Design a protein with these regions (language model features):
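N-terminal leader/signal peptides at the extreme start of proteins
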Residues: 1-13
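Short, conserved catalytic or interaction motifs in soluble domains
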Residues: 3, 27-30, 35, 54
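Residue-level signal for short amphipathic helical patches enriched in basic/charged
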Residues: 7, 25-28, 37-43
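Generic leucine side-chain signal with a strong bias for well-ordered alpha-helical environments
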Residues: 12-15, 25, 48, 116
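Internal alpha-helical transmembrane segments of multi-pass membrane proteins, especially GPCRs
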Residues: 14-17, 38
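Alpha-helical hydrophobic helix detector
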Residues: 16-31
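Conserved hydrophobic/amphipathic alpha-helical signal-anchor segments
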Residues: 35-73
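Periplasmic/extracellular, small/polar-rich flexible segments of pilin-like filament-forming proteins
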Residues: 61-145
Length: 145
């Protein structure tokens, strides 16, 4: 008398298909996540640079010209305005430049700069992102216009 043994489990082909599907999903997800991380780091630079805007505006309102440096604008030295991914925020003739850290920032933006440039009218200053060394795809939407 013969008994039939029912084999259970996955075959090698089924396992290979599952591994291939996971690899395809990872190939799509990892670059998207890397872009997300870089954009978050650039946002830190934008936030730190934007925090210096009121000081520049106050200087322009009081003196009628752009401040030549951080000290003139009433800000701390450039390296004292820093974050995890930003090494300094420097004011130069009204422009605010955030420089990304050479060690902690993603390699795509290390030592790159984000520049906010002012355009003054009689009652306000409008800030524009000037072309910087950061790739456009990583910039906030307000800088891509």
């Amino acid at each position: 008398m013969r008994t039939h043994v029912v084999q259970r489990g996955f075959t090698l082909i089924e396992l290979m298909i599952v591994v291939a599907i996971i690899a395809i999903l990872a190939a799509i997800a990892i670059p998207a996540y890397q872009n997300y991380l870089i954009r978050a780091q650039v946002s830190e630079g934008m936030n730190l640079a934007s925090a210096a805007e009121p000081a520049v505006w106050e200087y322009v309102a009081a003196k009628g010209v752009y401040p030549p440096d951080n000290q003139s604008a009433g800000l701390v030295p450039p390296t004292s305005i820093a974050g995890r991914y930003v090494s300094q925020v420097k004011v130069t003739n009204g422009q605010i430049v955030a420089k990304f850290n050479s060690t902690t920032a993603n390699t795509s933006i290390r030592n790159e700069t984000l520049v906010l440039s002012p355009v003054a009218t009689t009652s306000s200053i409008t800030w524009y992102c000037k072309p910087s060394t950061v790739a456009t795809k990583y910039l906030p939407s307000s800088c891509r216009e």
